[in-house]
Amino acid sequence: MKFFALFIYRPVATTLLTLAIAISGVISFSLLPVSPLPQVDYPVISISASLPGADPETMASSVATPLERALGRIAGVNEMTSMSSLGSTRVILQFDLDRDINGAARDVQAAINAAQSLLPTGMPSRPSYRKVNPSDAPIMILTLTSDTYSQGQLYDFASTQLAQKIAQTEGVGDVSVGGSSLPAVRVELNPSALFNQGISLDAVRQTISNANVRRPQGSVENQQQRWQIQANDELKTAEVYRPLIIHYNNGSAVRLSDVAEVNDSVQDVRNAGMTNAKPAIILTISRAPDANIIETVDRIRAELPTLQNNIPASIQLNIAQDRSPTIRASLAEVEQSLVIAIGLVILVVFIFLRSGRATLIPAVAVPVSLIGSFTAMYLCGFSLNNLSLMALTIATGFVVDDAIVVLENISRHIEAGMKPINAALVGVREVGFTVLSMSVSLVAVFIPLLLMEGLPGRLFREFAVTLSVSIGLSLIISLTLTPMMCAYLLRHQPPRSQRRIRGFGKMLLALQKGYGRSLSWVLGHSRWVLAVFLATIALNVWLYVSIPKTFFPEQDTGRLMGFIQADQSISFQAMRVKLEDFMKIVREDPDVDNVTGFTGGSRTNSGSMFISLKPLSVRSDDAQKVIARLRAKLAKEPGASLFLMAVQDIRVGGRQANASYQYTLMADDLAALREWEPKIRTALAALPELADVNSDQQDKGSEMDLVYDRETMARLGISVSDANNLLNNAFGQRQISTIYQPLNQYKVVMEVAPPYTQDVSSLDKMFVINSDGKAIPLSYFASWRPANAPLSVNHQGLSAASTISFNLPDGGSLSDATAGIERTMTALGVPATVRGAFAGTAQVFQETLKSQLLLIAAAIATVYIVLGILYESYIHPLTILSTLPSAGVGALLALELFGAPFSLIALIGIMLLIGIVKKNAIMMVDFALDAQRNGGISAHDAIFQACLLRFRPIMMTTLAALFGALPLVLTHGDGAELRQPLGITIVGGLIVSQLLTLYTTPVVYLYFDRLQMKFRRGKKLDPLPQ
C-alpha cells in the first residue's frame, strides 16, 4: 500500500491523471457507434437457383439435392435448409458464429462450381448467392405512390433508380422491390380468333420475336467519311406491335391486333402491393452482415432528398417503417436510468455520511469510473447498446462500493480525532485488501461468461467486459483518488445538516443497536439460523425448477410482421382481396400507425405485412397485447390466416417462418413425413402453451394433370415439344422478346387473354398446328383431370423436412411450450423414421437451458478459487459464498412476483448477485480475521464486533447497489422489457440477502471456524454456546 501513498502526497498528479481518464472517456463516448444490442448475427448465405417450369419435386431432386451435397461439405456449416417451389430453389446456409462471412462466401462459390456438372442443363443461369439472411426483418421500408403513374412505371423508377442507388449505400445488404413488376408489352391472345385464322400460338411468338431483333448492322466508309448503319429493327411500345402482320389469309393480312389485345403493362400481373389502403411499390431494405443499423439508416435518410429529386414530383417517396427511432428511444431511456441511478447512489451516500464534502468524493469517483469505461469500449470495438449501458447502470451501485468502504473507514478515523492525511494513510491501508478482494472476486464472476461459447457468450461479452472495466477503474480510483480527496477535503467537525438528516443518523444508530441485540440472540440460537440457511438452498432448487423460462425477453420494437397463409388452391385475385381485408382489420386498431403489405409472384397463396405501431408513449398497449387483440379479430376471416409476431433484434436461423419459434420434422421418406406432419400439427395446435401454430408443408395445391396420347400424337404429326410449347405460350406469361432501353431491359410477354387464364375449360379451346398445317384441338390427343400437387418441397440437411412454427400466447413461456411439444411427440407415438428437433431460437434456448446451471456453478467455483488465493484458506471463501442462497431465493421470488420468466437477462442478474452479495461477507470476515489475529479475541467476539463495526458500510453499499438497479425496475419506456428482468433480479436478491446474510454469515463463520479448529487440533467439535 506504500505505492498508493504517493497519490495522497501528490494531489496535482492524481487530479490530472483522473482528468485524463475522464477526457479520454468523453472523447471515446462521442466515437462509439449506436446499436440496439451487440452484434451477434450468425453468418448466413442464401443460394438461389431457377429452372423455369419445373415442379417443386423436380427442383428438390435435380437442383436442391446436388447443391446440398456440395455445400454440406463446407467447414463451419451448422445448419442447411432448402425450399423448392415452382421453378425455383433457395438453399440457406447458417455458419458458426466465428466463421468469417467472406471466407464462407468463397467456399460457397467453390461448392456451386463443383456441383455445376450435376445440375440440369436447361437452367437459364448459374446458381447465385447473397450474404443476407432472408429471415431478418428489414431495417427500413420505403413506399412509392402516385395518382398519375401506373404501378409498372413506379416499379421501374424503384428498381432502376432508387434500389440501385440505395444498394450502394454503405451497410446496405439487399434492397428488394415488390408490389408489381417491370413494365412490359403484354400480348393477350384470343384462341378462338387464332383458330378461325388457322394461326398457331407459336407462330405468333416467332413473328413477334423476329420483328424485334437488336443486331449490329455494321458500317460503310470511304476515304473521307464513315457511316454507321442503324435500322428500325426494334419495337418498343404496344402501339407499334399492334400492326404487325402475323399471317396472310387469302391475300388479306392478319395483324396482331386482329387476334390479340396488345397493351403497355407489366411483366407479371399477379403482383400487388399496398400501403394504408393505397396501391404502392414497396422497397424493403436489409442491412449487410455486421453493419450498424443506426449508421446505415442515417446514411439512407441522407440520400432520400436526392432520390426524391431524381424522380417526378408527382411520385411520393415515403418511409413506411424505420427501425432507428425505437432504438434511439430505448437507448435514451437507458441513459436516463443511468443518470437517475448515479443521482440515487450519491443521495444514499449523502444521507449516510451527512456531509457535502464527504459526498463529493464518491460523486467524483462514480462518474469517472463509468466515463473511463467508454475508452475500453472504444478500443474493444464495442457499441453503445442496451446491454452495455445496462452494465454501466448496474455498475453505478458497484463502483461506489469501493469508494464507500475507503471513505467510511477514513471518516471513522477522522471522527476519532486523527489528522486527515494520517487517517487517509491508515484507512486505505486497513481496507485496501478488502477493496481488492471485493473487486477481484466480482470480476471473477464474469470469467466463465467471457469464456462461454455460442450466442449467449457473444451476446453478453460486451456486458461483462464493460462491467469488469468499470469495476477495475473503480478499484484504482478508490485506492488513489478517493484517499487523496479524503485527505484534503474531510475535516473533523460535527455535520451541519438538516433535522431530517440528523433524524436519519439517530435512526441508523438505533438500527445498529437493535441489530446488535438481535445478533446476540441469533448467535445463541445458531441451529435455527443454520436450518433457515439450509432451507434457502432447497428453496432455490424448487424455485429454479418451477419458474417459467424463456430465451430472451420479448421485445417491443414498435414493429410487427404479418404472414398471410391462405388455402393452397387460392387464386391471385382472391389472395389480393384477402390481403386488403386483413390490412383493413389491422389498420383499424387504435395502436397501429402504418400498414404495408404485398402478395403475388412465386408466393401464390401467401402474403407479407409490415406493421408499424404508434410510439409507446401514446399507445394503450404493448406489442404482445396488440397481437392478442388482433388475433381474435383476424380469426373470423375465412379461407386464410394472418400470423403476427413482434419483430425482435435477436432471431436465429435462416428460415422465413410465419412465427417466432420453430420445430422441424425430418424424414428420409417424404411419404412418411406427409403422413405424420398433419397429425403432429393438429395435436400441437391444441396445446394451450402454443399460439399461431402453422406449417410450411404445402402438398395440397391444385393442379391439372394432362395425359398425352402419344400414339395419336404420332399419327397426327404432333410432338410433345409442340404440345408443351402450346401450354407455355398460352398460360405461362412467356417472355418472348426483349426491349432494350438506356437504363434497363424490358420484356414482351405473351399469354392468352384473362378470360381464358381464369377458366380451366379453356383447355378445350387450345389447339396445335400440325406438320400438315391443320389445327388440331388439344382434346384430340390429351386428356386432363384435377389433382393435388405440392407447392413446395423442403429439406433440412439432406432429409425431407417440414417446419412447424409457433408463437407464445400472451403471458406464455418458451419452457412450457417446448415441454408441451416434447410431451405431445411422446404421446403420439411418432415412429423413429420421423425425427423432430427444435430449430432457430428455440434450438438455442434448449442448448442454453442445459448450460445455465453449469455457468452458475462455474462462476461460483471461479469466485471460490479467487477468494481462496486471496485469503490463503479453503474455509473462509465458503463462509463468504454462504450469502448466495438467500440472494438466489430473493431473485427468483421477485421474478415470480412480477410474472417475469427466467431469461438470459435474469441469468445475468443472478451472476451479478454472486458478485454483489458476497461483499457484505467479505467486509465482515476481513475485520473478524484481523481482530482474531491481531487483537487476540475469540472468533465469537471477533465476528460480533465485525458485524457491528461494518454495519454502516454494509447498509450503504447494499442500498447503493439496490438504488442503482431500481431505475431498471421502474422503467416503462422503450426497451423496458429488456431492463426490467435485470433490475427485478438484483433488487429482489439484494433485499432478501440483506435481511438474511446479516445473521447467517456470522453463524456460518463460527461453524467453519470451529470446524477448522477441529482439524487443526484433532478434537471433537464442541457445540456453539447457547
UniProtKB/Swiss-Prot annotation:
Subcellular locations according to the entry: Cell inner membrane
Keyword line: Cell inner membrane, Cell membrane, Membrane, Transmembrane, Transmembrane helix, Transport
Record InterPro entries: AcrB_DN_DC_subdom (IPR027463), Acrflvin-R (IPR001036), Multidrug-R_MdtC (IPR023931)
GO CC term, one of those recorded: plasma membrane
Pfam families attached to this UniProt entry: ACR_tran
Top-level lineage group: Bacteria
Segments passing through the bilayer: 12-32, 333-353, 360-380, 387-407, 431-451, 463-483, 528-548, 853-873, 897-917, 953-973, 984-1004
GO molecular function, one term: xenobiotic transmembrane transporter activity
Membrane topology: Multi-pass membrane protein
HAMAP family tied to this protein: MdtC
Subunit comment: Part of a tripartite efflux system composed of MdtA, MdtB and MdtC. MdtC forms a heteromultimer with MdtB.
Protein family: Belongs to the resistance-nodulation-cell division (RND) (TC 2.A.6) family. MdtC subfamily.
Name by which UniProt lists this protein: Multidrug resistance protein MdtC
Upper lineage: Bacteria, Pseudomonadati, Pseudomonadota, Gammaproteobacteria, Enterobacterales
